[in-house]
């Protein structure tokens, strides 16, 4: 995690953490320590395990997406009926989750249920640039605004089509930018 709390509940970024100070997990309240090495990105790590059983491994792709949003909406704790989890982005009734690493269909569904029951709409951004780059995803011959997925992501292939307005799935298909500097994102519709 990039953010922790001080003893007086101020949010601190790992870059601003000082050695010897005490910091706490915003989800479980357990003590965390700053990891400020030269190999991995600076972050906080639990001294003992966290009660939050969701995995939060963050790649550079993930961090890059989070850094495009204001700090005050990143890694925000969502609490619902005694259960707490950390949203990548929480902004105006929306949770945005960035997914670079594999996630099971069960975990995908579990997270969606938690956030929607807590009253939020969920937007997932999946990194599928490898699939597009390897031509596993290609433009449809019938409609250039649609794509054909030769070997779809197992999680997305197993998900029942979303008929809800509470959940949206977006794919990043390439790291190229258009003339406006925007990433090439495509909303998934079943």
Language model regions located:
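Cysteine-rich micro-motifs
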Residues: 22, 26, 39-52
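Active-site metal-binding core of divalent-cation-utilizing nuclease and nuclease-like domains
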Residues: 12-17, 24, 29-34, 60-110, ...
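Short cysteine/histidine-rich zinc-coordinating motifs and their immediately flanking basic loops
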Residues: 36-43, 58-62
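Non-catalytic C-terminal interaction segments of nucleic acid-processing enzymes
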Residues: 1-24, 132-190
């Amino acid at each position: 995690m990039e953010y922790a709390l001080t003893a007086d509940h101020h949010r601190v970024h790992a870059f601003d953490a000082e050695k010897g100070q005490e910091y706490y997990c915003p989800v479980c309240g357990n003590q965390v320590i700053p990891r400020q090495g030269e190999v991995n990105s600076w972050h906080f790590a639990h001294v003992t395990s966290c009660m939050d059983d969701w995995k939060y491994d963050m790649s550079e792709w993930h961090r890059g997406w989070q850094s495009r949003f204001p700090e005050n909406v990143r890694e925000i704790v969502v609490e619902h009926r005694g259960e707490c989890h950390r949203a990548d982005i929480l902004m105006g009734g929306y949770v945005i989750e960035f997914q670079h690493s594999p996630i099971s269909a069960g975990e995908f569904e579990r997270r969606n249920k938690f956030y929607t029951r807590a009253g939020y709409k969920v937007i997932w951004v999946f990194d599928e640039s490898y699939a597009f780059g390897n031509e596993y995803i290609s433009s449809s011959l019938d409609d250039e605004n649609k794509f054909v997925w030769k070997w779809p992501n197992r999680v997305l292939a197993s998900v029942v089509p979303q008929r809800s307005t509470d959940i949206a799935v977006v794919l990043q298909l390439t790291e190229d930018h258009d003339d406006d500097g925007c990433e090439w994102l495509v909303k998934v519709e079943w």
